[in-house]
Amino acid sequence: MELATTQSVLMQIQPTIQRFARMLASVLQLEVEIVDENLCRVAGTGAYGKFLGRQLSGNSRLLRHVLETKTEKVVTQSRFDPLCEGCDSKENCREKAFLGTPVILQDRCVGVISLIAVTHEQQEHISDNLREFSDYVRHISTIFVSKLLEDQGPGDNISKIFATMIDNMDQGVLVVDDENRVQFVNQTALKTLGVVQNNIIGKPIRFRPLTFESNFTHGHMQHIVSWDDKSELIIGQLHNIQGRQLFLMAFHQSHTSFSVANAPDEPHIEQLVGECRVMRQLKRLISRIAPSPSSVMVVGESGTGKEVVARAIHKLSGRRNKPFIAINCAAIPEQLLESELFGYVKGAFTGASANGKTGLIQAANTGTLFLDEIGDMPLMLQAKLLRAIEAREILPIGASSPIQVDIRIISATNQNLAQFIAEGKFREDLFYRLNVIPITLPPLRERQEDIELLVHYFLHLHTRRLGSVYPGIAPDVVEILRKHRWPGNLRELSNLMEYLVNVVPSGEVIDSTLLPPNLLNNGTTEQSDVTEVSEAHLSLDDAGGTALEEMEKQMIREALSRHNSKKQVADELGIGIATLYRKIKKYELLNT
């Protein structure tokens, strides 16, 4: 590296840009490097925070490419990009992924903002969020130029960058100054805390971390957040950035709660607790498909929260202020299910109400109908439901004229409907109508990264409900819980936390002596191979019908056209990578 001989426009405001880099790294959980037009490092984080002001070596081909072409450069797999050929560091490159965005001032590229992954987790983070990060950094770059360079007001306009960054986050964010007064708060945080901006900006606020060692969760920690006469318990991360504290909420524990047994009245996307990759993908998918009127099929084992997902989709849709009607097809006797769904008119049959009855489908008009355990619906009713979906009308029992209905149907099952179709237990044509948008929920055993976060979530849920003191939890207990197979999924974990809240002495720590015997016996056993439920909605080999296979082939072809990575295709379809390659070979899609 060499010292720069002339000071660039970016280098003139280097302290501000360094602050900007640290903010960006904290928000996106990636390394950041910013260089000027002379390839001098203006700012950086981690290993890229060294040698500021010095010119980078000739191996900086990616940065040089962005400067010369004035275009964005993306590398999701290091060493395989053509620009990496001939690089001295190619075989030992620490950069696993790269996203470089040009800083354009008056048609001149004056620098590059780059996001860098140095771990496999960060590499997946970039790949999973590529479009969002690209748009995000491009937007920030525009503001960066217009407010910092053209206005030459670095001191004042850093606030505008802060505000833009946090407003574009789906996490709740609070930023306080060196006097602990709230300086910024984004819409997600306002919504979560139930306050309006004018009632919290400028107010002194206190973050008091709980002291149990085991409360740390992948860098998150429980905090008592207090302002005015209010106190809230929130799990999140607190970052110090040059005189400011930036608090990133993982989730809030004091308002409407995620409940498996009893879903909240108004669930939102952030109440799907989890930060593992599959849960992040699930939340993004729900956000994308919620506005659509198309039918959704939610597939998942018992206890994975299928109704919570259905309610979240409804609350994010344009039907949010309309009815959400839920019915469990397995919980109602077959002879009563038709009248519950379709209703009946006065005198329709012996024992009928004198006034008749409005069916649940009609009650859901203009809103959402959630059909849980759809696989248990009798075949006769399946035909009637199909007619209602296709004609957008229902015929109550005993009625002579149909009633028009406008509903969105979300169905759910923990069964293999493809097998049911092959056995003649489920109508193939109804499956097509209901499975327009398939969503697969992961079992808890595949979410080990989220176990500790969920443990604290349910602990707070039950201590608050039972009026108990919040307990600590020993690290070895958390490890046992991570290794447990959780056949009951979230419902089982919630019930266990309720049990522990009841038996732990007030104010003490939950240790392994309090765990039920079945957890101690099974918690450390190796997990056996299991058939993924996620394949249930896609793997239709056993159905035996050409139409089903054609549908499967089309789904795979369309997914392949949308993604460059087979891993991304498999993730979207909810199947394993080996299964995907098997299907590609079967349907001769190798050149797609």
UniProtKB/Swiss-Prot annotation:
SUPFAM superfamilies: Homeodomain-like, P-loop containing nucleoside triphosphate hydrolases, PYP-like sensor domain (PAS domain). Disruption phenotype: Deletion of the gene abolishes urate-degrading activity. Residues 158-229 form the PAS domain. Keywords: ATP-binding, DNA-binding, Nucleotide-binding, Transcription, Transcription regulation. The keyword Hydrolase does not apply. ATP binds at residues 300-307, 364-373. One of its GO terms (cellular component) is protein-DNA complex. The keyword NADP does not apply. GO terms for biological process: positive regulation of DNA-templated transcription; urate catabolic process. Residues 272-502 form the Sigma-54 factor interaction domain. One of its GO terms (molecular function) is ATP binding. It comes from the Bacteria. Residues 567-585 bind DNA. PROSITE patterns: PAS, SIGMA54_INTERACT_1, SIGMA54_INTERACT_2, SIGMA54_INTERACT_3, SIGMA54_INTERACT_4. It holds the Pfam family HTH_8. PANTHER family: PTS-DEPENDENT DIHYDROXYACETONE KINASE OPERON REGULATORY PROTEIN-RELATED, TRANSCRIPTIONAL REGULATORY PROTEIN. Essential for both formate-dependent and formate-independent uric acid degradation. May be directly involved in the transcription of uacF in response to hypoxanthine, xanthine, and uric acid. This is Putative uric acid sigma-54-dependent transcriptional regulator UacR. It comes from Escherichia coli (strain K12).
